[in-house]
Amino acid sequence: MKRVFIDGSAGTTGLRIYERLAAREDLELLILPEELRKDTQARKEALNSCDVAFLCLPDQAAREAVSLLENDRVTVLDTSTAHRTDPGWAYGFPELGKDFQDKLLTSKRIAVPGCHASGFIALVKPLVDRGILQNTSRLSCHSVTGYSGGGKAMIAQYEVQERSELLGAPRQYGLTQSHKHLKEMAAICALEKPPVFSPIVGDFYSGMVVTVPLFVEDLSAGKTMADIQKAYEEQYTGPVVRYRPQMDEEGFLSGAGLSGKDAMEVTVCGNEERMVLIARYDNLGKGASGAAVQCLNLVLGCDQTTGLEL
């Protein structure tokens, strides 16, 4: 039986990971009393006595947690932004290819992808890898997410009885083009420049839809929407990320279509002049805790879908 410690188990992602793992008979969860959750010595002892540690912490706190590790047998799964572009860490998105799978399986340091970044990378990287898009491409992206993506503070803001009327409509943020996922988007896709990125939070708890619009002129010479469809069909053959030829729901596409699920659906819609690449998933599922548990399963050598809701 493997011992697992969740550092930051009281946060949104940490709680979801705990809920997924608590009933598993192949794992023993190390749980600190509430009064010791922020005690450095208690955390250090737990981090060094487990087999796998989840870090569900802000970036700086995650770095500090890593500095507490002295046991080189501990595998770390970090859900923060801190290590996602660090070459010494595996990037926890096995569907991106054999290199990603192999590094994940052999690494003791794994960075769990960001929620917005997961959709953008799933859509763009297979196209760059196949030369359908160039790494010099200037792309744009918008991403609509449920408010749980903002953590406990935003959840409380949206669910309080007397709240601002402004919360009833979608709200754009990241307006200065300095969102923390931009570096990750560019690095994993090997793009020279990150996209122009417009994240949007909506008045629904969880779910996410990420869109990358393209003109056919944005594609490499001679490439068409059919090449994109083929790329996704080839790339996503596993149980978690799936290509869907059509996601149209009577002319609409709901961002909450996979709320409560750990799968991701990708598709391309449009025509031979203009097209949109679309990824749909749950910001708390494949965008956070579901991806983390999938990585844990692979590290432990069990079915990657164990404990996932697909």
Model-flagged regions — what are they?
Residues 10-44, 135-138, 142-143, 147-277:
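C-terminal substrate-binding/catalytic lobe of Rossmann-fold NAD(P)-dependent oxidoreductases
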Residues 12-18, 118, 153, 211, ...:
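Short, electropositive, low-hydrophobicity segments enriched in small/polar residues
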Residues 237, 255-310:
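C-terminal helical cap and adjacent loop that interface with cofactors, partners, or active-site loops
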Residues 1-173, 269-271:
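N-terminal Rossmann-like NAD(P) cofactor-binding subdomain of oxidoreductases
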Residues 119-120, 220, 224, 287-288:
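Secondary-structure boundary/capping motif
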Residues 18, 121-128, 182-186, 229, ...:
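Predominant activation on well-ordered alpha-helical scaffold segments within soluble catalytic domains
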Residues 7-13, 113, 145, 206, ...:
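Short glycine-rich loop/turn motifs that provide flexible caps or phosphate-binding loops at active sites
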